[in-house]
Amino acid sequence: MRFMDTTIDLRCAKRNMLIIILVIAASLLVNISANAQNAEQWKTLEGDVNLFIANDLGRNGYYEQKPVAELMGEMAGAIGPEAIVAAGDVHHFEGVASTQDHLWMTNYELIYAHPELMMTWLPVLGNHEYRGNTQAVLDYRNISRRWEMEGRFYTKVYDDNGVSIRLVLIDTTPLIDRYHHSATYPDVDSQDIDTQLKWIDKTLDEAKEDWVIVVGHHPMYADTKKDIIEQKDMQSRLLPIFQRHKSKVAMYVCGHIHNFQHIRRGNDGIDYVVNTSGSLARKVNPTDGTVFCSPAEGFSVVSASKNQLNLYMIDNKGNVIHKIERFKK
């Protein structure tokens, strides 16, 4: 009869287990060190007033949505933003049916669950929200304390350490003709375009803050395979207003195209920024006026001091891949 040497087997098992534990411990130490290093680097982005901008999110956590959400939470811990500006399409693909739609959990609550993301969110409507019940998107502020959407278009001022930023948050889908008279976008036709445009003009006219940023979902300028008529409609309705207030408007920031683009056109001095998707990005090529473009997923960080406004484009690894700087003259 053959007997196995169990003593040797136990020694081997213990040794293997020790190796595994040491490897795991070393990996954790590397991750902790890397996170600490990242936090120190991210801290340098902080200004007197800080904001995150994220959009084109709702993929039920798939693709890069969950990793980017976790990254946002980690960076928020280092930078301490006052709010997260959600520049449309928090929900793909057909919007939401009600405030109780399960998509609120799978697209938003369970994804952006990091403790540092339990702060004010300032959303605007995107074209995908308009495929569903847009009033439910507004009414969700009665369900979630962090969903501070005051209207289809509204303004918000942040003032800290003597530095002020005015956000002018607008509803761009009704400004584009192709969304009208369509059963796919049932709430568009009931929106009063003229009322919104007059409100934007008046709000910019009365703005006295150090910095003014206009945020909408659709781009004024962009490289895209989408119908160029979208940009032409935006330009015909908004550019005259922006031109009247070009001394005040620092940036127009949007989403919709699912990549990063920084564009300067004409002599109005405004930076036109396309913020990428926080879940699934698309290819991009330079176009007329392109300063920078990238197909990376991610989000943007805005930081302001009295004399300087910065927008940092952050990829899905937490790297700053482009910086827009504006200075007070």
What are these model-predicted stretches?
Residues M1-K14:
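N-terminal secretory signal peptides that target proteins for export/translocation
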Residues I19-L29:
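Bacterial N-terminal signal peptides
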Residues A34-H102, D223:
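N-terminal active-site segment of His-dependent metallophosphoesterases
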Residues K43-L45, N50, H92-W211, D227-M251, ...:
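Extended active-site neighborhood of metal-dependent phosphoesterases/phosphodiesterases
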Residues I53, A86, R265, A304-L309, ...:
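Generic beta-strand structural signal
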Residues N55-D56, G88-D89, I170, G216, ...:
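Active-site flanking residues adjacent to catalytic metal/cofactor-binding acidic residues
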Residues I84, V212-V214, Y252:
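Receiver (REC) domain switch-region micro-motif
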Residues G318-I321:
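Residue-level signal for glycine
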